[in-house]
């Protein structure tokens, strides 16, 4: 299975990068993992609704340019469906069973995702109704992917 994690912005916090690197190493036993970061759009702190839409559109175009046409796309979005770890594992396993061996997870920037990214997504996934920094969310996603593969293989994991 080929899994791509696409996100907006460069990871800055060393401790988050260390955590992601650890889970990437662990995941390499189960799947081919690719991490792609696209530049975030520089914008002032206070934006009009139209300016926010334009920032998300530009970031969305960068994300979409990195997705292969045959990828199954799962966008992380607060309004997405929440799943247990077991349900996520089953979802990933079923995608592989039905010939979807390329999965792309998308994490938006600080303003979220563009309408074009939502339109391309095959599925919206939420980890919580709370808002998290997108860099921290990337670490949580890597951990949940690792946990999913452990569950799929019937290997022990912490509950």
From Swiss-Prot:
Q: Which Gene3D superfamilies match?
A: 3.40.1280.10
- Any one Gene Ontology molecular-function term assigned to this protein's record: rRNA (pseudouridine-N3-)-methyltransferase activity
Main location, first listed in the record: cytoplasm
Class in the EC hierarchy, top level: transferase
EC numbers on record: 2.1.1.177
Q: Which UniProt keywords apply?
A: Cytoplasm, Methyltransferase, rRNA processing, S-adenosyl-L-methionine, Transferase
What NCBIfam families is this protein classified in? PRK00103.1-3, tRNA_RlmH_YbeA
What interactions and quaternary structure are annotated? Homodimer.
Q: Which HAMAP family match?
A: 23SrRNA_methyltr_H
Q: What is this protein called?
A: Ribosomal RNA large subunit methyltransferase H
- Give the species: Shouchella clausii (strain KSM-K16)
């Amino acid at each position: 299975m080929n899994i791509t994690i696409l996100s907006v912005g460069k990871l800055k916090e060393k401790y988050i990068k260390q955590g992601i690197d650890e889970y990437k190493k662990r995941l390499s036993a189960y799947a081919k993992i690719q991490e792609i970061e696209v530049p975030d759009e520089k914008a002032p702190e206070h934006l009009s609704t139209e300016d926010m839409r334009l920032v998300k559109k530009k970031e969305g175009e960068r994300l979409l340019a990195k997705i292969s046409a045959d990828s199954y796309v799962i966008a992380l979005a607060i309004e997405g469906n929440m799943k247990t770890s077991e349900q996520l594992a089953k979802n990933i396993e079923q995608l592989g069973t039905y010939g979807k061996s390329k999965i792309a997870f998308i994490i938006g920037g600080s303003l979220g995702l563009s309408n074009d990214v939502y339109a391309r997504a095959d599925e919206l996934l939420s980890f919580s109704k709370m808002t998290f920094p997108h860099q921290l969310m990337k670490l949580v996603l890597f951990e949940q992917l690792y946990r999913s593969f452990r569950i799929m293989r019937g290997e022990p994991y912490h509950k």
